[in-house]
């Protein structure tokens, strides 16, 4: 599938940086709040608990982003899906859905693992009120298939992703909020995989093969 819009490398990099900063600004801000509480000399235990939980949250988000958006090694490198599972599990400890991962641990090309992690973010966006998000890895290391099934209240395919996936030119320019759906489809194109969407009243299934 050809994307209906093309971003320059400079714009893509800048927008992804904005997206990552948006993801970590909340836990980093909470760390700062905890430090201010300590400086004021009140509620030391509460302040330390806030600092610790926020630091773990920020670390989990950065570790996830390192693989999902970053180089994570040299060009052409393969990534262990076990590492992807670990960073995803830690990331979703701070999110609403119940998260499960099923599938054999294999080495896959970097762009395919990046695609998988970005599909998790799309799935998470489909259940804004929480629910469950289940990942299943099928096929082989040479011909993998990813299946992400989400269930929950207010199910809906994220509008920006649906718009870009349909092949229609977006009504508004790609910004820091819509760059992740764009990047997901770009990764699928680079990896030679096709993303399919199957939505019912009970669940939404995103698959790539």
From Swiss-Prot:
One of its GO terms (cellular component) is cytoplasm. Coiled coil: none annotated. GO terms for molecular function: protein homodimerization activity; protein kinase activity. Belongs to the ChpT phosphotransferase family. Each ChpT monomer is composed of an N-terminal dimerization and histidine phosphotransfer (DHp) domain and a C-terminal domain that is structurally similar to the catalytic and ATP-binding domain found in histidine kinases but that lacks regions required for ATP binding. Component of a regulatory phosphorelay system that controls B.abortus cell growth, division, and intracellular survival inside mammalian host cells. This signaling pathway is composed of CckA, ChpT, CtrA and CpdR. ChpT efficiently and specifically shuttles phosphoryl groups from the CckA kinase to the receiver domains of both CtrA and CpdR. Does not bind ATP. Overexpression of chpT results in a defect in cell morphology, DNA content, and intracellular survival in human macrophages. This is Protein phosphotransferase ChpT. The lineage of its organism: Bacteria, Pseudomonadati, Pseudomonadota, Alphaproteobacteria, Hyphomicrobiales.
């Amino acid at each position: 599938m050809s994307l209906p819009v093309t971003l320059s490398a400079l714009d893509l990099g800048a927008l992804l940086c904005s997206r990552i900063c948006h993801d970590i600004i909340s836990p980093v801000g909470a760390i700062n709040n905890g430090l201010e509480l300590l400086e004021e000399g009140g509620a030391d235990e509460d302040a330390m608990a806030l600092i610790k939980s926020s630091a773990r949250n920020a670390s989990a988000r950065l570790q996830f982003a390192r693989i999902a958006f970053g180089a994570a090694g040299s060009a052409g490198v393969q990534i262990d899906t076990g590492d992807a599972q670990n960073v995803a599990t830690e990331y979703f400890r701070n999110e609403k859905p119940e998260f499960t991962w099923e599938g054999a641990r294999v080495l896959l090309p970097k762009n395919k693992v990046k695609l998988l992690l970005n599909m998790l973010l799309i799935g998470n966006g489909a259940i804004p009120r929480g629910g469950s998000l289940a990942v299943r890895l099928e096929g082989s290391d040479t011909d993998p298939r990813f299946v992400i099934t989400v269930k929950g209240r207010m199910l809906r395919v994220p509008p920006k992703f649906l718009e870009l996936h349909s092949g229609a030119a977006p009504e508004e320019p790609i910004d820091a909020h819509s760059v992740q759906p764009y990047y997901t489809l770009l990764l699928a194109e680079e990896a030679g995989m096709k993303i399919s969407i199957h939505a019912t009243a009970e669940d939404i299934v995103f698959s790539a093969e």
